[in-house]
Amino acid sequence: MAASFLPSILVPLVGLIFPAIAMTSLFIYIEKQEVN
């Protein structure tokens, strides 16, 4: 029972966390470029 619910929880979680990490790393990269 629990295993069938895991994908429906993990997919949105990964879908929200991965873009958040990507945007954060991109923001840090841009900030470093402006400093240099």
From Swiss-Prot:
Biological processes per GO annotation: photosynthesis
Transmembrane segments: 9-29
GO cellular component, one term: photosystem I
Keywords: Chloroplast, Membrane, Photosynthesis, Photosystem I, Plastid, Thylakoid, Transmembrane, Transmembrane helix
Topological relation to the membrane, as annotated: Single-pass membrane protein
Subcellular location: Plastid, Chloroplast thylakoid membrane
Recorded superkingdom: Eukaryota
PANTHER family: PHOTOSYSTEM I REACTION CENTER SUBUNIT VIII (PTHR35775:SF2), PTHR35775
The family this protein is said to belong to: Belongs to the PsaI family.
Function: May help in the organization of the PsaL subunit.
NCBIfam families hit by this protein: PRK11877.1 (NF008830), PS_I_psaI (TIGR03052)
Descriptive protein name: Photosystem I reaction center subunit VIII
Higher taxonomy: Eukaryota, Viridiplantae, Chlorophyta, Ulvophyceae, OUU clade
